[in-house]
UniProtKB/Swiss-Prot annotation:
Name of the protein this chain belongs to: Mediator of RNA polymerase II transcription subunit 20
Coarse class of the protein's main subcellular location: nucleus
Protein task: Component of the Mediator complex, a coactivator involved in the regulated transcription of nearly all RNA polymerase II-dependent genes. Mediator functions as a bridge to convey information from gene-specific regulatory proteins to the basal RNA polymerase II transcription machinery. The Mediator complex, having a compact conformation in its free form, is recruited to promoters by direct interactions with regulatory proteins and serves for the assembly of a functional preinitiation complex with RNA polymerase II and the general transcription factors.
Subcellular location: Nucleus
GO molecular function: transcription coactivator activity
Gene Ontology cellular-component terms listed: mediator complex; nucleus
Pfam families, per the entry: Med20
InterPro entries: Mediator_Med20 (IPR013921)
Family matches, as PANTHER family: MEDIATOR OF RNA POLYMERASE II TRANSCRIPTION SUBUNIT 20 (PTHR12465:SF0), UBIQUITIN SPECIFIC PROTEASE HOMOLOG 49 (PTHR12465)
Subunit-level organization: Component of the Mediator complex.
GO biological process, one term: positive regulation of transcription initiation by RNA polymerase II
Family per similarity comment: Belongs to the Mediator complex subunit 20 family.
Keywords carried by this UniProt record: Nucleus
The encoding gene: med20
Length: 193
């Protein structure tokens, strides 16, 4: 079972970081481009009650995840969102999009993507998967060293907003984890305003 490292930065100094990071990965580490990575998150508010409805779609996962509250998450067909919009019982509130690519470098799979709210840059997300061990304790320093060497060699002073290391059987990020990441982002924005 691979070990995953998810790291999210929102420092303005990293706003133009995606393209050079991808180029460096390919040129220096001979990374093989596997596919594009696109995630779309949408938040709706109930027109009558103070409830929220969230949708999450990934191009690497055919089903859509719908979440009415934190305890209830279901796999849904994309048509569900069309029905929600047409009934006008839910009002669109905001959306985030992750746009990037997935690469393979030896025992690592690396996904790098910009996080956008409409067209405004909100951060950069890194997802590193390591197949060398199943132990999170052993893999964490290996992933961190790989990450620093590949991406932050000249910019070590930037600190992540979110960092997590864990086991998961699949190589792609679980939709529920991405939903939690977006929730954290929304909560952080709400606290600032």
């Amino acid at each position: 079972m691979p070990v995953h490292g998810v790291i999210y930065y929102s420092s303005p100094s990293m706003a133009t970081f995606l393209s050079p990071a991808q180029d460096n990965l390919v040129r220096t580490y001979f990374a093989q481009h596997l596919k594009k990575w696109v995630v779309q998150y949408k938040l709706y508010r109930n027109a009558v009650t103070p409830k929220t409805l969230e949708f999450l779609k990934q191009n690497i996962n055919p089903s859509m995840l719908a979440c009415v509250d934190e305890a209830t998450m279901i796999d849904a067909e994309p048509e569900l969102e069309d029905i929600i919009v047409r009934t006008k019982l839910w009002n669109f509130r905001q959306s985030f999009t992750i746009e990037g690519s997935i690469y393979e470098v030896g025992s690592f799979k690396v996904a790098i993507a910009n996080v956008l709210q409409k067209s405004v840059w909100k951060g950069i997300l890194f997802h590193v998967t390591y197949d060398g061990t199943e132990s999170v304790d052993l893999a964490r320093p290996i992933i961190q060293e790989f990450f620093l060497k590949c991406f932050l060699q000249n910019n070590k002073s930037v600190t992540p907003v979110y960092e997590s290391f864990f086991n998961q059987p699949r190589h792609s990020l679980d939709s529920k984890l991405l939903l939690q990441l977006f929730k954290q982002r929304i909560d952080t924005v709400s606290q600032r305003t």
